[in-house]
């Protein structure tokens, strides 16, 4: 994201937005409709800055396809937080910015990774009382829609994020491991991907996943990577079995693409809710893709 401010352009009251890359034709250029600039305005208004500085021009280069399980909305939220922090010269810490992000995204998985970078584990603190109530404020009050006839003070008093909503840790990552993403030309709605998940799981399936998660987070930091350990630790019973019918060919891919058939492969899985498929590998990247 490139941002320039020309304070001499006193007749330009609102930011001028432009886009390139994925979604460029569909991204709203109205700063009161665009997610990135709405988030930036939220940050500034929480800190008593009523409006954008004059003469702001923003160009967004987006390399993340929308609706593919790659966390595009989380990345946009973080871009907006960083933009608001810079425009308002607020010097908000990284950990505090995560609190702001969680008022919008409501779960830390994507926003923590986008903000911190690297291989991240995260969780939400269980809040009580007023702090818990604040995090449940409808998103429409955090990022209000701006009608055409909205006054300048519309949405000026947004909720202030409680302190310490989200917590994270950065895991180690072996230098040999590379990430491959295979991005289909169709979308899977996150709401639909969540809807197909069951409300209850068997204890056996949860234990299966938790055991492997504990092994996986450590094994990905070991150098050289243990192929068999990582491949087995990436097996899943919690979400892929229920979402596989949303992605044509996924069951066949998961069953047939292995370290034996594709040397260099460490493991393969859905990226987020899909439909993107993510593979970890050390070699033969083009062949695996």
Where are these regions (language model features)?
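Solvent-exposed alpha-helices and their adjacent loops that cap or buttress functional pockets
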Residues: 49-52, 70, 104-105, 112-114, ...
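Active-site rim beta-loop-alpha module in soluble metabolic enzymes
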Residues: 180-245
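Active-site glycine-rich loop that binds ribose-phosphate moieties when present
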Residues: 99-106, 123, 127-172, 199-201
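ATP-binding N-lobe of GHMP and related small-molecule kinases
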Residues: 1-68, 82, 86-92, 127-128, ...
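Short beta-strand-to-turn element immediately C-terminal to the catalytic PLP-Schiff-base lysine
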Residues: 6, 114-116, 120-126, 162, ...
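Glycine-rich, charge-dense phosphate/pyrophosphate-binding loop(s)
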Residues: 220-289
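Beta-strand segments within the central parallel beta-sheet cores of soluble alpha/beta enzyme folds
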Residues: 54-60, 92-103, 232-233
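DPxDG-like acidic metal-binding loop motif
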Residues: 70-94, 114-125
């Amino acid at each position: 994201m490139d941002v320039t401010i020309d304070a001499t352009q006193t007749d330009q009251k609102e930011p001028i937005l432009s886009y390139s890359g994925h979604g460029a034709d569909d991204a709203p250029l109205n700063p009161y409709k665009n997610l990135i600039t709405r988030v930036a305005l939220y940050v500034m208004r929480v800190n008593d800055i009523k409006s954008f500085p004059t003469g702001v021009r923003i160009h967004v280069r987006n390399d993340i396809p929308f609706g593919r399980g790659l966390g595009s909305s989380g990345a946009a939220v973080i871009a907006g937080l960083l933009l608001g922090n810079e425009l308002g010269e607020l010097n908000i810490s990284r950990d505090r910015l995560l609190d702001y992000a969680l008022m919008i995204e409501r779960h830390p998985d994507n926003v923590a990774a986008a903000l911190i970078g690297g291989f991240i584990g995260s969780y939400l603190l269980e809040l009580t009382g007023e702090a818990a109530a604040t995090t449940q404020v409808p998103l429409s009050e955090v990022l209000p829609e701006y009608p055409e006839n909205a006054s300048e003070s519309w949405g000026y008093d947004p909720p202030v994020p409680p302190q310490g909503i989200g917590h994270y840790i950065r895991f180690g990552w072996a230098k040999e491991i590379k990430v491959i993403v295979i991005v289909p030309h169709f979308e899977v709605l996150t709401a639909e991907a969540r809807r197909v998940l069951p409300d209850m799981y068997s204890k056996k399936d949860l234990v299966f996943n938790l055991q492997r998660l504990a092994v996986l987070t450590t094994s990905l930091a070991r150098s050289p990577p243990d192929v068999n350990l990582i491949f087995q630790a990436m097996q899943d019973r919690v979400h892929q079995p229920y979402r596989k019918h949303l992605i044509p060919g996924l069951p066949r891919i998961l069953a047939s693409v292995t370290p034996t058939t594709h040397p260099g492969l460490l493991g393969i899985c859905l990226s987020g809710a899909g439909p993107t498929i993510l593979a970890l590998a050390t070699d033969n990247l083009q062949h695996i893709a």
